[in-house]
Amino acid sequence: MFNEIAGGVDDSGNQYYETIAGGSGATEGSDGASAVQVHMTNTRSTDPEILEHRFREIRLESFRIRHGSGGDGKNKGGDGVIREINFLEPRKVSIVSERRKIPPYGVSGGEPASCGSNLLRKVSGEEID
């Protein structure tokens, strides 16, 4: 399963839609990769400069590795990301994601990774997860 977010339209009518990176599982011989597109081929996160130039109502406030979120073990699972997006105008936003209640499991003695989370913070300060 992949994680994706959609919301916003640029001046040409193109919609904002992107897959959200995560961590890949470890293998028998190496740690997993952090902040990568795991199950979607031919996709990547939009560069912040491109995102903000094309979609002027969107600001990427933070995009960083979520250190410690990958599962521990002989070889550690890759860490996910934190991506904080600020919509400067009212928008309808959709997100499709998984592993928010049940963590990614560990195999061959590895520990589970941390659950992901989605948080919507409204202008009023109300938070919805």
Q: Across the structure, where does each feature detected by a protein language model lie?
A:
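Glycine/proline-enriched, intrinsically flexible loops and inter-domain linkers
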Residues: 1-129
